[in-house]
Amino acid sequence: TVKEERYTSGVTQYPPLLSPILALRTPPGTKMVVTGFTGPYKLTDEVRNQNDEIVHICAGSGVVPSFSIIKYDLRVNEKLKHTLVYSNKKHEDIIFDEELAQLKRDFPDRLKVIHTLTREDDPTSFGENIRGGRISQPLLSEAIGSPEKTAVFVCGPDHHPWQKKEAKEKGETLPTSFLQSALGFLAELGVTKDQITKESYG
């Protein structure tokens, strides 16, 4: 069921984009076509052939496209190693927790997963490679090691253009987003822009 999102000027953060079209302008019986992977957030042959490892830095539901890449590549190819740095608030928020654990058992030499939990009192009690706090430069340095022959995929929350516009009009500074933090740390570690594939939501 698709419900129309309402928009009230001055109250709603920004106008809804898709739900009014689906809820109000799409008659019953309309056929929809669901396509495969599109857009820049995908593992191309060029990236696969030029690198030995892919490091994925994700937060929340941003893990979904990277999980698809990891799962497919581990099963279809034999070369690349993958490291996933995955940030959530609570342990119960981890998406694909069991699936990732199974992939680690199936491919112990090719997949490493590091979880960071920002709102757990004792995150290490949940198991190995589970850390507390937000992503940091030392954590990404540990995950990446030497940036040579490494590509990085980053997916997580960033500020929506409407938020940026509103903050600018009010003369306010928005807090640093997950995506901004990750890209800043990567630059400090010497990872170049052409090594990074990014996607955000907000």
Where are these regions (language model features)?
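Histidine-anchored nucleotide/phosphate-binding helix
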Residues: V63-N77
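Conserved S-adenosyl-L-methionine
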Residues: Q50-D52, L74-H82
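Short, Lys/Arg- and Gly-enriched loop/turn segments at beta-strand edges
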Residues: S9, G39-R48
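Reductase modules of NAD(P)H-dependent flavoproteins
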Residues: V85-G202
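Conserved beta-strand elements of the Class I
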Residues: E53-I57
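A short acidic Gly-Thr/Ser loop motif
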Residues: A59-G60, P157
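Ferredoxin-reductase
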Residues: T1-T30, N88-K90, T118-E120
